[in-house]
């Protein structure tokens, strides 16, 4: 039975705009129990408002990865509140199809610290010793 969630929220439609898929948010080792708002319904999960900014204080064992604002090609802020939190969609040219991919595992993924890179999450999933449950959805962001 899955006990931890991990996800990436990315923008493949940013590739023609900036030359790479924009990472908006990545999270690892979030205990599913921490999101349950109805303990009588194991599928009733909720993410509270401003979750990304509140997460370090609310659930310290959960780690957030760097978003694309951390890219050395952008010269943006080194502030963890900017580069290691949710970075909301702002399609600059047209509507974009964003992709949310979620994985569920029985155990937390080892070796991931605050500010991990997305490839480290993918390696940790592949090397976890289990086949994670996974699902994804495309979400449209309006220009």
Spans of model-derived segments:
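N-terminus-centered regions that define maturation/targeting leaders and the start
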Residues: 1-143
